[in-house]
């Protein structure tokens, strides 16, 4: 009978309004039900498990207390929002999560009115929610609440602190919920903390606090200057009682907590107590990443996005073929260690992605020369610049889509000084199931105009090693290498590293009719496409250009003089990217071939598998083969 009760509660909730119709004593069962549903679905349909298991009680409490979607919930990053999706009309299609034409793995306003703001990159929630809260005040929507939910990891991002610093500058009733899951901030949850929350959230306390201030002002014992002194005294007293200085109240944000983020009934009480308080406020909750699934609780990093797993045994289902190609990420990690073994100046830097980019190899081999700086892409670049300025040779590894956040630092702090560092752009190109917020498709276009940069992309793992060596040994300025997520093409890649001449491409295949110019691993799709049309009466040349900047102008002159038809292929946006650079060269030098550019179109590409997205963009071997036939 207990199982039927669980199923009944789950089946009865389609939208938050259904949840709000339940009595509060049912909420614990709703949480257990929701947590199990997430585990059931993600065991077969991979996604971000740990973070969403940790926010089940918070999600239920938020939708129970607040009138969503009129009230706005802004999720930071969005990894923790799966429960939110299930409770807001997407339970029956949750199994399509991160699949092509299915629902997104992140909050997306185009998908649901309950998704108040786009999420994917960290640390934006406070600024976005503050803007929405101020807008509500300007529109006299005094009954609308705006809540930002941010994890302690995302709080390391500079944008979060910019939002905190500005939160009290304009009238707003913003509520910030800090989800502290022991990944960065560590405060204990005890009787004193809960007692302080009970006191500071009680209506009687806050009415007294307001009445005292109003009374002092009425009898002219308080003005704005004295008000600041009283606030400082209040904050100092609380700091004394808690034996800590409160950062948030230093920003004039009222602080409550920490509280147990897995006590749904207490969360409901606290949220009801503070939701109508005037001014910006922050509720600090303590949660456990992976809560309710023992393997995920015990290994938060491994179970952040574990892939398929056996929900009964807790074993991850990892299918690997014998002698399959290595991940580009592992090639980077092993190669960096090899280089570092021979030069003590080499250091590694990454903003919060040591496992994803395989900086962990460097951290294990040379812990004093490898740095995880947290979710702080701009800092990672400028920190690396400082290292380079003092004679170190940093390898700064940043995901391509996250490097967008450090653009000014690349220009101002690195390129202007022509500092010797290697910037490795991991996850370059289409990345698959994480979708539009994570596709690394803009880097070729946004880095190409910057003076002093060398920009390269390897065809395979062998050339990734060679380019890392080239950036280290053969160029004394900033050297950018972009490469994709996932497996490469080769089983035997541990070559003796060699310099790839800067600004020089390679002819992979000779031909007389059509010249195909590719850059990066997408060239392997070209190789397959040419094989598909080998029976056609067309002679196709294929060039692996390797370098976007500087271009191999000598080779391009030869191509411009010989071919009337050119196809460029890149795993990036075609506007402003590699194909555009080839077109500019041809126009500037008086060549007039017909140039067809293949790459990512002028659109934000959805989520799906790499083969599906390649086909969508016409970048897969079959689509390229069709274009070759069309050009014939």
From Swiss-Prot:
<dbReference type="GO" id="GO:0000287">
    <property type="term" value="F:magnesium ion binding"/>
</dbReference>
<keyword id="KW-0808">Transferase</keyword>
<dbReference type="GO" id="GO:0016114">
    <property type="term" value="P:terpenoid biosynthetic process"/>
</dbReference>
<feature type="binding site">
    <location>
        <position position="377"/>
    </location>
    <ligand>
        <name>thiamine diphosphate</name>
    </ligand>
</feature>
<keyword id="KW-0479">Metal-binding</keyword>
<dbReference type="GO" id="GO:0005829">
    <property type="term" value="C:cytosol"/>
</dbReference>
<dbReference type="InterPro" id="IPR005475">
    <property type="entry name" value="Transketolase-like_Pyr-bd"/>
</dbReference>
<dbReference type="Pfam" id="PF13292">
    <property type="entry name" value="DXP_synthase_N"/>
</dbReference>
<comment type="subunit">
    <text>Homodimer.</text>
</comment>
<dbReference type="InterPro" id="IPR020826">
    <property type="entry name" value="Transketolase_BS"/>
</dbReference>
<feature type="binding site">
    <location>
        <position position="79"/>
    </location>
    <ligand>
        <name>thiamine diphosphate</name>
    </ligand>
</feature>
<dbReference type="GO" id="GO:0019288">
    <property type="term" value="P:isopentenyl diphosphate biosynthetic process, methylerythritol 4-phosphate pathway"/>
</dbReference>
<dbReference type="GO" id="GO:0008661">
    <property type="term" value="F:1-deoxy-D-xylulose-5-phosphate synthase activity"/>
</dbReference>
<dbReference type="GO" id="GO:0052865">
    <property type="term" value="P:1-deoxy-D-xylulose 5-phosphate biosynthetic process"/>
</dbReference>
<keyword id="KW-0784">Thiamine biosynthesis</keyword>
<feature type="binding site">
    <location>
        <position position="293"/>
    </location>
    <ligand>
        <name>thiamine diphosphate</name>
    </ligand>
</feature>
<keyword id="KW-0786">Thiamine pyrophosphate</keyword>
<dbReference type="InterPro" id="IPR029061">
    <property type="entry name" value="THDP-binding"/>
</dbReference>
<keyword id="KW-0414">Isoprene biosynthesis</keyword>
<protein>
    <recommendedName>
        <fullName>1-deoxy-D-xylulose-5-phosphate synthase</fullName>
        <ecNumber>2.2.1.7</ecNumber>
    </recommendedName>
</protein>
<comment type="function">
    <text>Catalyzes the acyloin condensation reaction between C atoms 2 and 3 of pyruvate and glyceraldehyde 3-phosphate to yield 1-deoxy-D-xylulose-5-phosphate (DXP).</text>
</comment>
<dbReference type="Pfam" id="PF02779">
    <property type="entry name" value="Transket_pyr"/>
</dbReference>
<dbReference type="InterPro" id="IPR005477">
    <property type="entry name" value="Dxylulose-5-P_synthase"/>
</dbReference>
<feature type="binding site">
    <location>
        <begin position="120"/>
        <end position="122"/>
    </location>
    <ligand>
        <name>thiamine diphosphate</name>
    </ligand>
</feature>
<comment type="pathway">
    <text>Metabolic intermediate biosynthesis; 1-deoxy-D-xylulose 5-phosphate biosynthesis; 1-deoxy-D-xylulose 5-phosphate from D-glyceraldehyde 3-phosphate and pyruvate: step 1/1.</text>
</comment>
<comment type="similarity">
    <text>Belongs to the transketolase family. DXPS subfamily.</text>
</comment>
<dbReference type="InterPro" id="IPR033248">
    <property type="entry name" value="Transketolase_C"/>
</dbReference>
<dbReference type="Pfam" id="PF02780">
    <property type="entry name" value="Transketolase_C"/>
</dbReference>
<dbReference type="GO" id="GO:0009228">
    <property type="term" value="P:thiamine biosynthetic process"/>
</dbReference>
<dbReference type="GO" id="GO:0030976">
    <property type="term" value="F:thiamine pyrophosphate binding"/>
</dbReference>
<keyword id="KW-0460">Magnesium</keyword>
<feature type="binding site">
    <location>
        <position position="181"/>
    </location>
    <ligand>
        <name>thiamine diphosphate</name>
    </ligand>
</feature>
<dbReference type="InterPro" id="IPR009014">
    <property type="entry name" value="Transketo_C/PFOR_II"/>
</dbReference>
<feature type="binding site">
    <location>
        <position position="181"/>
    </location>
    <ligand>
        <name>Mg(2+)</name>
    </ligand>
</feature>
<feature type="binding site">
    <location>
        <position position="152"/>
    </location>
    <ligand>
        <name>Mg(2+)</name>
    </ligand>
</feature>
<feature type="binding site">
    <location>
        <begin position="153"/>
        <end position="154"/>
    </location>
    <ligand>
        <name>thiamine diphosphate</name>
    </ligand>
</feature>
């Amino acid at each position: 009978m207990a199982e039927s009760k669980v199923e009944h509660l789950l089946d009865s909730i389609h939208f938050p309004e259904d949840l709000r119709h339940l009595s509060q004593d049912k909420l614990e069962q709703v949480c257990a039900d929701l947590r199990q549903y997430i585990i059931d679905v993600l065991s077969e349909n991979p996604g971000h498990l740990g973070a969403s298991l940790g926010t089940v009680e918070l999600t239920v409490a938020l939708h129970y207390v607040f009138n969503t979607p009129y009230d706005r919930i802004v999720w930071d990053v969005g990894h923790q929002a799966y429960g939110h999706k299930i409770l807001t009309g997407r339970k029956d299609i949750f199994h399509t999560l991160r699949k092509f034409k299915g629902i997104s793995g992140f909050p997306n306003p185009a998908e649901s009115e309950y998704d108040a703001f786009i999420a994917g990159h960290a640390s934006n929630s406070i600024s976005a929610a503050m803007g929405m809260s101020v807008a509500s005040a300007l529109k006299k929507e005094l009954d609308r609440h705006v809540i930002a939910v941010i994890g302690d990891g995302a709080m390391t991002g500079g944008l979060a602190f910019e939002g905190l610093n500005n939160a009290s500058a304009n009238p707003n009733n913003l509520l910030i919920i800090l989800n502290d899951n022991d990944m960065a901030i560590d405060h204990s949850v005890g009787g004193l903390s809960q007692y302080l929350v009970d006191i500071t959230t009680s209506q009687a306390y806050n009415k007294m606090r307001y009445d005292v201030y109003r009374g002092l002002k009425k009898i002219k014992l308080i003005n704005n200057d004295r008000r600041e002194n009283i606030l400082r005294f209040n904050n100092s007293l609380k700091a004394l009682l808690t034996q800590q200085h409160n950062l948030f109240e230093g920003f004039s944000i009222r602080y409550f907590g920490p509280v147990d983020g897995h006590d749904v009934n207490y969360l409901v009480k606290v949220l009801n107590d503070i939701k109508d308080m005037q001014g910006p406020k922050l509720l600090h909750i303590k949660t456990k990443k992976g809560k309710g699934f023992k393997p995920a609780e015990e290994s938060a990093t491994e179970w952040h996005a574990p892939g398929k797993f056996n929900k009964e045994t807790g074993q991850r289902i990892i299918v690997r073929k014998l002698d399959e190609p290595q991940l580009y990420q592992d090639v980077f990690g092993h190669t960096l260690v090899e280089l570092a073994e021979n030069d003590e100046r080499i250091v590694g830097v990454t903003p919060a992605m040591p496992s994803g980019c395989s900086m962990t190899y460097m951290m294990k081999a040379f812990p004093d020369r490898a740095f995880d700086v947290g979710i702080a892409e701009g800092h990672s670049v400028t920190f690396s610049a400082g290292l380079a300025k003092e004679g170190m040779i940093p390898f700064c590894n940043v995901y391509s889509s996250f490097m967008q956040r450090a653009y000014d630092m690349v220009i101002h702090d690195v390129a202007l000084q022509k500092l010797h560092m290697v910037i490795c752009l991991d996850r370059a190109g289409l990345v698959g199931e994480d979708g539009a917020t994570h596709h690394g498709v803009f880097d070729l276009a946004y880095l190409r105009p910057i003076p002093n940069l060398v920009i390269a992309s390897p065809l395979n793992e062998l050339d990734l090693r060679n380019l890392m060596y080239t950036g280290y040994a053969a160029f004394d300025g900033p050297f950018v290498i972009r490469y994709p997520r996932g497996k490469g093409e080769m089983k035997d890649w541990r070559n003796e590293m060699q310099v790839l001449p800067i600004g020089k491409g390679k002819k992979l295949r000779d031909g007389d009719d059509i010249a195909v110019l590719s850059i990066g691993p997408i060239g392997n799709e070209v190789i397959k496409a040419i094989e598909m049309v080998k029976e056609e009466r067309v002679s196709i040349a294929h060039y692996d250009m390797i370098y976007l900047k500087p271009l191999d102008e000598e080779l391009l002159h030869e191509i411009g003089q010989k071919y009337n038809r050119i196809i460029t292929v890149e795993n990036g946006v075609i506007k402003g990217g590699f194909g555009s650079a080839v077109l500019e060269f041809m126009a500037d030098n008086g060549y007039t071939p017909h140039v067809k550019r293949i790459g990512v179109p002028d659109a934000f590409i959805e989520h799906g598998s790499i083969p599906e997205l390649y086909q969508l963009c016409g970048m897969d071997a079959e689509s390229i083969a069709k274009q070759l036939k069309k050009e014939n």
